[in-house]
Amino acid sequence: MRKKTTRYSLKIFLSLTLFLAVVVVMAMVTVRTRARPQWQQKVDDWVLEEAGAADEVEFLVVLKDQADLGRISDRLSKAEKGAAVYNSLTDVALRSQASLIPDLKAAGADYRPFWISNMIWVRGDRTLVESLAGRPDVAHIAANPVVKLDLLPEQATAYSSAQDSAVEWNIALVQAPNVWAEGIDGSGVVIGGQDTGYDWQHPALMNQYRGWDGQSASHTYNWYDAIHEDNPNTPPGNPCGFDSPQPCDDQGHGTHTMGTMVGQDGAENQIGMAPGAQWIACRNMEQGWGTPATYAECYQWFVAPYPQDGDPFSDGDPTKAPHVINNSWSCPAGEGCVDPEVL
């Protein structure tokens, strides 16, 4: 009888201990949350740390008002759906950003508004971060770190090497030639790629570039450069420059990936999976360094391409959007790419 009582008492003791531990942890979390000012609860820790260590920091101001695209009918054509998405996203962003942008101008901050997600890229100090986070129309101040992707050097050079056979081994392995024999080679499809850029004059890519008609090139609506300024982490003097008016690759990886998609020059360089498709592109990295903002800007351009010097809110043309998009890169959690409000 004493053994049963002892066991029963032990169970009660362990249960009470576990209960008290949970209560203590919850109390600590509550105290910690209450200890942080309300505006800080909207701000990513990375932004607070960087803003405290530097005069200025890049961040993304995500607004509460976001477009509801679920109301757009699935029965619409691609062109109709593209127009509906573009109009809905731009309308919400223009309306809700109207009262915030004057404050950014008054603060002398650099900024770039987006509509793909209702947010604004901003470069400013901690005072501005606090001011923006305190606004009721702001949902979140997200991080925008500059991170170098692990792009293998051999990937950048393998594409330019001489090939021994007309059809590359990887293309043959998936039996793509058998599909081509059925008349399916990507014809009528436009592929969008975002990466380190693209060498549009490469012999295996030039004829598939939508901006090339065989005699002259038109890069408007077919190419966009989301790299607008030098990255402090890279050597000065980018070989492509910034806001490049034509496709350019400052690292080589992007050209390699496009070759895998559509590459063929009619001779030995039959290395693409869909050689009949056309391609358009956006540069989202400077020599392998990218940010959530540059990735989002390329996605925005793909939804409704616009000229390099155009206004994304009024000059976008959804009819020129690609049918599919290829991303041969990763965006880890440490780069701020786990936030569904941003990407």
Predicted region positions:
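N-terminal secretory signal peptides that target proteins for export/translocation
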Residues: 1-9
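Substrate-binding/specificity loop regions of serine endopeptidase catalytic domains
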Residues: 330-343
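Subtilisin-like serine protease catalytic core
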Residues: 35-38, 52-56, 72-73, 140, ...
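Inhibitory N-terminal propeptides of secreted protease zymogens
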Residues: 33-155
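Bacterial N-terminal signal peptides
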Residues: 15-25
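Acidic glycine-/aspartate-rich tracts in secreted/extracellular proteins
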Residues: 64-69, 126-127, 147-148, 196-200, ...
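Structural motif
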Residues: 60, 324-328
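Sec-exported extracytoplasmic/periplasmic mature domains
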Residues: 105-109, 133-137, 198, 262-266, ...
